[in-house]
Design a protein with these regions (language model features):
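Fe-S-dependent hydro-lyases/dehydratases of central metabolism
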Residues: 1-190
Length: 190
């Protein structure tokens, strides 16, 4: 998955290296961060935002990448578009230049937030070099008390592990509490 903020540089690197998008049918783009909430009409009041959407459109048109554009009815927040459009499935690997990419883990996907150079590598090869992650399973049993929600659960876990507790790990969440969570609650945790 790609969006307008982290992909332009990756497409530029591809051009500089005379590389093409290897599998455009496996890459999906949406305009996300720059879309005004009060109106989605173009041109946007912000000229930089307008330029960013035009550049993403051009990059997708030139490379054959599927673009969920504003008028398509499929455009939205990049870490929500994947599940909404059926792209995110159990067992798939989802990578995106967005810190909320881990949200896809709620659907049983391996979800990786990556940088611009890794976006370039994925576009060019559909592969990327990764250090082997350790796996940490978090098991939460019992019932949540009234007024305790998914956000409270994950904040408690983060408090126990520390803000760097996830570095170098892939997390599995298990137990009665997670089993009973809705998909929205699981997305909150991931």
């Amino acid at each position: 998955l790609i969006h307008e903020v982290t992909s332009p540089q990756a497409f530029g690197m591809l051009r500089d290296l005379n590389l093409k998008v290897a599998y455009p049918h496996r890459t999906f783009a949406t305009v996300d961060h720059i879309v005004p909430t009060d109106t989605r009409l173009e041109p946007f009041a912000d000229p930089l935002a307008d330029a960013m959407i035009r550049e993403l459109r051009t990059n997708c048109e030139e490379t054959g990448v599927t673009f969920f554009d504003l008028p398509s009815g499929k455009q939205g927040i990049v870490h929500v578009v994947g599940p909404e459009q059926g792209i995110t499935q159990p067992g798939t690997t989802i990578a995106c230049g967005d810190s909320h990419t881990s949200t896809h883990g709620a659907f049983g996907a391996i979800a990786l937030g990556i940088g611009t150079t890794q976006i370039r590598d994925l576009l060019a090869t559909q592969t990327m070099a990764l250090a082997k992650l350790k796996v940490r399973r978090i098991n939460v049993t019992g019932k949540l008390r009234p007024g305790v929600y998914a956000k409270d659960v994950i904040l408690h876990i983060i408090r126990q592990l520390g803000v760097k507790g996830g570095t170098g790990y892939a997390y599995e969440y298990a137990g009665e509490v997670f089993d009973e969570f809705s998909m929205e609650e699981r997305m909150t945790v991931c």
